[in-house]
Amino acid sequence: MRDITPDLCDKYESQVTLLNLPLQNFGQRSAFWGEIVTVRCYHDNSKVRDVLSQNGKGKVLVVDGHGSCHKALMGDQLAILAIKNDWEGVIIYGAVRDVVAMSEMDLGIKALGTSPFKTEKRGAGQVNVTLTMQNQIVEPGDYLYADWNGILMSETALDVA
């Protein structure tokens, strides 16, 4: 376990913004960071699967599920896919499922809540678009730093050492 965001705030206060969303921790990895990749979708996780199928080394996926906790946008199978493809973590403004299994996986996972319902698979959604969640903007290509203290974003990569 490692606290990174307090030190980053102390060192880079003028360069970071807080992604202030009421998210819970679901993955085993307590701290994670990387370049932001975005997906916007609603009750359809097809694009989430497409993105997590790609190499995620040094990247964090941020998913805008419109804040809906009716259907889970990620479960254990997508978490396994993310780990296989070296993703650092996933932030979901929506729901996840299979939370006991994911709690034992070495992946950073934060989400609004849980739902046992799966999503539809219609191929709907957008990839690498600017997201606005609770009046907060998330840009693909920026950098995200997360731990149990919070989530920070920066336009440039920061030294986490």
UniProtKB/Swiss-Prot annotation:
Signal peptide: none annotated. The keyword Signal does not apply. Keywords: Lyase, Metal-binding. GO terms for molecular function: 4-hydroxy-4-methyl-2-oxoglutarate aldolase activity; metal ion binding; oxaloacetate decarboxylase activity; ribonuclease inhibitor activity. It is an enzyme of class 4 (lyase). It comes from the Bacteria. A divalent metal cation binds at residue 98. It catalyses: 4-hydroxy-4-methyl-2-oxoglutarate = 2 pyruvate; oxaloacetate + H(+) = pyruvate + CO2. Its EC number is 4.1.3.17, 4.1.1.112. Substrate binds at residues 75-78, 97. Pfam families: RraA-like (PF03737). Divalent metal cation. Its cofactor is a divalent metal cation. One of its GO terms (biological process) is regulation of RNA metabolic process. Belongs to the class II aldolase/RraA-like family. Catalyzes the aldol cleavage of 4-hydroxy-4-methyl-2-oxoglutarate (HMG) into 2 molecules of pyruvate. Also contains a secondary oxaloacetate (OAA) decarboxylase activity due to the common pyruvate enolate transition state formed following C-C bond cleavage in the retro-aldol and decarboxylation reactions. Homotrimer. This is Putative 4-hydroxy-4-methyl-2-oxoglutarate aldolase. It comes from Vibrio cholerae serotype O1 (strain ATCC 39315 / El Tor Inaba N16961).
